[in-house]
Amino acid sequence: MQRFYVVKEVLSDKLKRVYEFTVGNEYLEQQVDDRLREIAANVRMDGFRKGKVSLDLVRRNCGEDVVREVLSKVVDDASSQFMQEGGFGDVVTSEVRITSHPKVCSTEGKGGDLVYELQFELMPEVPSINPEEIALKEMEAEIGQEDVDKFIGELKTRYPNFVASDSPKQRAAAGDKVVIDYNSSFKGKALRGGSAKGFVAVLGGGHLPKEFEDKITGMKVGDVKEFKLGFPSDYRVRLFAGKEVEMSVKLVSIMVPKDVGDHEELAKSCGFGCAEDMVNFATESLKGRFAFMSDALMRKELFDHMETIYQGQVPESVVSQESARIRRELAPSELEAMGEDGILKEAERRVRLGMLLMKVSQDNNIAVEARDISAFVQSNYLNYGASLESVLKLLRSNQGVRDHIRGKVLEDKVVRYMVAKAKKERQNVPAGDLKSLFESI
């Protein structure tokens, strides 16, 4: 295809490219005239038969729209032809900036060429990886009686046994289970749904606002306390969010935690049929917990190996996006500890890994299917701080969310494929050592 434009290189820096295109006014006028004739041959206007509208009338009525249409098409055609002939391969981002607008089909006369810049960033070539040539350590935890006992101790803490206090002088303290009756009002008016009888909560368990718990702490059975309580604007219960509410609280009963020394008694309090069932549950839970840790360590070892394979250039625009994502994900204290250089290095590392994983997916025809997306959302929607229905709605309506989740799913699918194909060196390690290794990641 013959070129209708002149192009010159403005910038070639690493992966960045900038080219200046010039399209002559004569060519543009011809394209506009051809389009106007095409419209005139088919347009219907009052007082004219089809195809009998004068070109000047069409020019007056449609000229500006046709010029915009032609300029857009010329830019697209010139850029596409140049990119195809140049063999640039995959492009990460591209941007067009018109630097000189021509006078075409204008009442102010004709003249001037179309001049615009095409800026883009290349996707670098990354090497292929054969997962079968990678060796990974597959650690299996040696679970001992000490580990099982520790897990059962966690059950004691998680499911404490409470008994009613028989002392009239007993005051509510952190760790106690209390039963309260309460009423709430706002500006002297009772809040609908803002009262309850027999409400049960464990002090210090995070079920109540801390200020509320502080007011209850120290009360005795039968005590009534009235106080004002302020709720933050983002409080999960809309009824109270952003309000200072008058509260009246009566402490009905106090139950204190009682240590359960006998395994049979603990098993029954936790809902197991017998102590043996509880021990079996503890053992299987530990196996699952340590299998997760082992898998995470293998993934880290895989990523560390992949980092050595490609240390080449990465697209700055993608690194910039990843840096912004890191800043959104991490707490201010973590960002301060990393520093700007640390954030940049981590962003570059993530982008390189992403490029390599994408290459593996292309080489091995690994694709994301609808059922993969569905399974991911079902398992991870709580991580987005929303209900399943809300995340699904966001997935349907937000392209950015769709791309993010699709990327996470593809990464997980490719990593699982690579781990499955890699050679494994099985190692038995004490459970405590495996836990320490996992916590050091």
Curated annotation (Swiss-Prot):
Transmembrane segments: none annotated. Its EC number is 5.2.1.8. One of its GO terms (molecular function) is peptidyl-prolyl cis-trans isomerase activity. The keyword Glycosyltransferase does not apply. GO terms for biological process: cell division; protein folding; protein transport. Keywords: Cell cycle, Cell division, Chaperone, Cytoplasm, Isomerase, Rotamase. It comes from the Bacteria. Residues 175-260 form the PPIase FKBP-type domain. One of its GO terms (cellular component) is cytoplasm. It is found in: Cytoplasm. It catalyses: [protein]-peptidylproline (omega=180) = [protein]-peptidylproline (omega=0). InterPro entries: PPIase_dom_sf, PPIase_FKBP_dom, Trig_fac, Trigger_fac_C, Trigger_fac_C_sf, Trigger_fac_ribosome-bd_bac, Trigger_fac_ribosome-bd_sf, Trigger_fact/SurA_dom_sf. Belongs to the FKBP-type PPIase family. Tig subfamily. Involved in protein export. Acts as a chaperone by maintaining the newly synthesized protein in an open conformation. Functions as a peptidyl-prolyl cis-trans isomerase. Consists of 3 domains; the N-terminus binds the ribosome, the middle domain has PPIase activity, while the C-terminus has intrinsic chaperone activity on its own. This is Trigger factor. It comes from Anaplasma marginale (strain St. Maries). The lineage of its organism: Bacteria, Pseudomonadati, Pseudomonadota, Alphaproteobacteria, Rickettsiales. The gene is tig.
